[in-house]
Structure formats: C-alpha cells, structure tokens
Curated annotation (Swiss-Prot):
Similarity annotation: Belongs to the nucleotide-sugar transporter family. SLC35A subfamily.
Source organism (scientific name): Cricetulus griseus
Quaternary data: Monomer.
Function: Transports CMP-sialic acid from the cytosol into the Golgi apparatus, functioning as an antiporter that exchanges CMP-sialic acid for CMP. Binds both CMP-sialic acid and free CMP, but has higher affinity for free CMP. Also able to exchange CMP-sialic acid for AMP and UMP. Also mediates the transport of CDP-ribitol.
Signal peptide range: none
Gene Ontology CC terms, in alphabetical order: Golgi membrane; membrane
Keywords assigned by UniProt, alphabetized: Antiport, Golgi apparatus, Membrane, Sugar transport, Transmembrane, Transmembrane helix, Transport
Locations listed in the record: Golgi apparatus membrane
Stated name of the protein: CMP-sialic acid transporter
Entry keyword annotation includes Cell inner membrane: no
Domain of life where this protein originates: Eukaryota
Cystines in this chain: none
Parts of the chain on the Cytoplasmic side: 1-9, 65-87, 136-141, 197-209, 263-269, 316-336
Amino acid sequence: MAQARENVSLFFKLYCLAVMTLVAAAYTVALRYTRTTAKELYFSTTAVCVTEVIKLLISVGLLAKETGSLGRFKASLSENVLGSPKELMKLSVPSLVYAVQNNMAFLALSNLDAAVYQVTYQLKIPCTALCTVLMLNRTLSKLQWVSVFMLCGGVILVQWKPAQATKVVVEQSPLLGFGAIAIAVLCSGFAGVYFEKVLKSSDTSLWVRNIQMYLSGIVVTLVGTYLSDGAEIKEKGFFYGYTYYVWFVIFLASVGGLYTSVVVKYTDNIMKGFSAAAAIVLSTIASVMLFGLQITLSFAMGALLVCISIYLYGLPRQDTTCIQQEATSKERVIGV
C-alpha cells in the first residue's frame, strides 16, 4: 500500500485545527440564528446540496492553482475524474455511508428519549478511535484511550438537557432506536476513517479526492432533497427562504468542510473529533452571549472534561497521524 509522505509543520496542523474549530463554532451559532429567526424558513436539504456544489467548485479552483497550467489541470481532471470511474466509486462510499448515518440518527431520535439519544450517540467518538486502530493499523496509548472516553463524557455533559415531561404520547420502539443508533455510530466511525485511509494511502492530490467525493455527494444530497422536500420545493422554489444570513451559513459550511478534509489528511479523525468537541463548547459560550442561553453545572463540568481530554491527548506521544506499516515491512537485520 502506498503511503502519502507530505511533510507539514506542527504550526500548519495547529492552524488547520484552530480554523476548523472556529468555523464550526461560528457555523453552529449562525445556523441556530437562521433556523430560529426567519419568517420564511428555508429548506435545510437544499442548503446541504448547495454546500456540496460550492465545495466542489472551490476544490476545482484549488486543483487548477495546484497544477499551475490549463493543460496539466485538464490532464489531471481527465485522468483522475473522468477516466477513473473506479476511483469515483471508491469515494462514493463515504457519501452513501453518511447518508445512512443521518437516516439512522433520525430513526433513533424518533424511537428514543432525547437524553438517551444524546448519551448513546456520543459513542461515535470511541468508535472512531477503534476504527482508526483496526483500519489504519495504529496504536493508541492507555492515556490516549482515557482521553478519548473522557472527551466522550465531556461532550455528553456539555450537550445534556434534562428530560421534559410531555403530554404528547408517541409510540416508540426502544429496540429499534438502539439498533438505529448502533448503526449510526458505526457508520460515523467507518466513513470518517475510510476517507482518511483513502487520502493517506496514495499520493493523489487532496483536491482531486475532494472532487471525487463531492461529485457523489451532490448526487446523494439531490436524491435526499427530492425525497424529503420535493413537493414543497416544486411549489415554493429551490431557494425559498434564502437570505444573506443563509448564504453566510452555507459559506461557513463549505469552508468548514474543506478544512475538515485538510485536517483529516494531515492529522487524523480523532483530532477532528477533539476539534468538534471544542467547537461545541465555543458555540455554546457564544449562544450564552447572543441568545441568552443559561450556563448549567453540567455544561461547566463537561467543558472542563473536554479541555482536560484535549490536553491529555496532546501530550508527547508516538505520532498517530500516519498510517503505520505492517510488521512484515519493518526494517530487519540480516545476518550474513
């Protein structure tokens, strides 16, 4: 298996993680604003689809800049996109798996209490770590495993909301709910690590890989848009309810998605999870200032756990951002 050998500085990795965290936090706050203040609510499915298109266009532009000339740009597209249906199929896997994950998450939330859902869904964090170990032949120290589960607990506390009594009786199937959440958790871990493995297992340009994935992502989101809101979109229009704020949210989602791929390429999915947790804490603090959200004891404790877990995971350790070679490929001393 080939191995990508980009040498990037620690500063660049920290920069990408910091930008991804800040963009994700800003995106959460902006998204909340557009979904709670708009009189004419836009279709979230169309926003996701437009985001995929914008990420594709930006990736095409960055590939053109990377290749340096129109001829090399056309040759790269022809060789890696138009002439590589196998590679396109390979990169369609994450898009399809994420689509399954989103549907399973919705099914789980429909059959479980919100509090139970919040707790069980955070198992995607240790599941991602497990997939990293199994699929990429990496090893995590005991302290790293402790920090991963500590992060899981911290996110649960940060997002914890006490259960509220309701007069509406909804028929639920806990068994179906737990089954759906298990599939969603596995899909989350597998899709992220699969994409990381594809990125790091060859010297193919990151922007080529993004183009391959976003092409399939556009198809998947278009199908989802049609199935979810097709009738209403036909009546009201694809861009119904769009404002400058909605376009700003789409811009943040696009930039965040691109930085996520860079983070996965040059660090790993576990670090991406830590960044996402930090973004949750930052967005909640921002919501306190902007929307008057009340800080709870569980949030304070959870935020503390998140910070401690990030510190523990970042302690000096063996580098886990590159795919490890199999034991049989290690250097051996040959006696003559």
